[in-house]
Amino acid sequence: MATKHQFQTEITQLLDLMIHSLYSHKEIFLRELISNASDALDKLSYLTLTQENLKTLSFEPRIDISFDEEKKTITIEDNGIGMNENDMKEHLGIIAKSGTKSFLSQLSGDKKKDSALIGQFGVGFYSAFMVAHRVVVQSKKAGEEKAYAWVSEGKGEYEIGECVKESQGTQITLYLREEDAHFASRWEIEGIIHKYSEHIAFPIYLAFVESKFEGEGENKKEIKENKQSQINTAKALWKIPKAELKDTDYKEFYATLSHDNNEPMRWIHTKVEGNLEYTTLFYIPQKAPFDLFRVDYQSGVKLYVKRVFITDDDKELLPPYLRFVRGVIDSEDLPLNVSREILQQNKILANIKSASTKKILSEITNIAKNEADYKTFYEQFGKVLKEGLYGDYENKEKILELLRFDSFKSEYISLKAYKESMGNEQKSIYYMLGENKDALKNAPLLEKFAQKGFDVLLLSDEIDAIVMPMVGEYDKVPLKSINSKEALAELGEESIDEATQNAYEPLIKGFKDALGEQIAEVKLSSLGDAPLTLIKEDNNPMMANLMAQMGQKVPETKPILQLNITHPLFEKLKTAQEDKIKQSALLLFGAALILEGSTLKNAKDFNTELNSLLLQSL
């Protein structure tokens, strides 16, 4: 007896969206269901090699499609892994890997763009409801006895019950809406398969009725004959020699592989022979995948052994900083029954990974030769590329060459260009870390370097706080934070004479008394336009904020205060009353902290003194 179940809230939202909103490119429903069938065949192909109870299974993978114009139905069937009752509940009734939540959060309101997101978010099955008022799924899991039927009209609930099905696999029948009945046509289905699923690695067969006429005049008779033909080529495109492939072949395969409606930016097709034999086909997308910065991101690379699918969920096939790459690795040397544990320690795969990484970085270097193309690439993938600096020491120098930065003088500069622009007086490549570029550009400390004609890299990506201190140097030139003592020493600031130092001692003492344990020292300076500058050895407010967000204890670094005695404010403060000096110290220190992106510890005191100053000025 069938039992009723409620969809999760997000699934109900998604179904409503599919039925009422995402009607642009409705034809993708077939692409998605064929893709799911292909995945089911991939999984069973692998299990027949690795799972004892399935090794004797007779299995010739295929996808069958049939239709009935009168009944307005389309049926898609595969003989893959199949589903049992629990699988149906998990895959068809609730959210898997937060895919649906992510999908819903990414919707833009543009129907064409939103339709294009369907496959990328793993919610493709529900696209059936774009054209069907009723969907019936009958499935039998390989190695199990019972078969189950899943039925829904897309209205918030579904039913599951036992059914009769002889062989393993899944059959999905769509009962089409009146306005979508035209999809139940041989030519419609063939056209969609050629457009979206030509390069699916398994044969797709279409059953149809062909009419023939015999006789003449009144004796003319229509003879209907049931026929079946294979629609796709079912070839592993990556195994076809490059000379035999056209750009359109690569682009069509990319669409099948990635479910991305945009064309790829570049592709790299490599066949390696010798001690190791393998083929790789990698794509660099135009747009970043939605989960690029998620911990549970989906790997974009599929691993095959001798054309047998092994996994699409191994994040070690490429370094994490190349997780935007889509593609295929097909090895001739790995054992077919390779396990996930073996994969992680396998020398063959490690060699393939190393060579593939170099190939991809080389192609990115080629993109960088065209500034317009590289700006497009870097806007999408620049942040994630920086991660390679702390994880891929072998390719660190190549990655450094690929990075681009905003600086005080330029909006888009490489380290090579920065170095070439350095004057003879400049000893280091200088950078400054902060939460946003506007704050960095207004930082008082930056003025000191600008006055000397030194350019400064302005770094506001969170990843910068982690990787830049680790870089050390570029082409034998050290990289230094402008907050460091070494960088400040390179400014060559004129020393303060003894008479001036003595004249300002009361003011220095007043600042020390007012700020107490919040500072390490007060010094005099004569460079820059700002009245006060904070100096912290290895100051990194971004890193401090990151550590605080992660619940880690932030090591306290007390700043050195530099008072700019060329600023008219200090000429007046030098003879001011003690209460005025205290008030000025608190306000100037607080303002400097805000400018550098640090947190005010004594915000209440700052606010009190600010209000007091405003009252005095009125």
From Swiss-Prot:
Q: Where is this region: B?
A: 341-545
PROSITE patterns cross-referenced by the UniProt entry: HSP90
**Disulfide bridge partners, by residue number:** none
Q: Pfam families given for it?
A: HATPase_c_3, HSP90
| Species assigned in the record | Helicobacter hepaticus (strain ATCC 51449 / 3B1)
Query: Any idea what this protein is called?
Result: Chaperone protein HtpG
**Region described as A:** 1-340
Give the principal location in a single coarse category.
cytoplasm
**Similarity comment:** Belongs to the heat shock protein 90 family.
Briefly, what is this protein's role?
Molecular chaperone. Has ATPase activity.
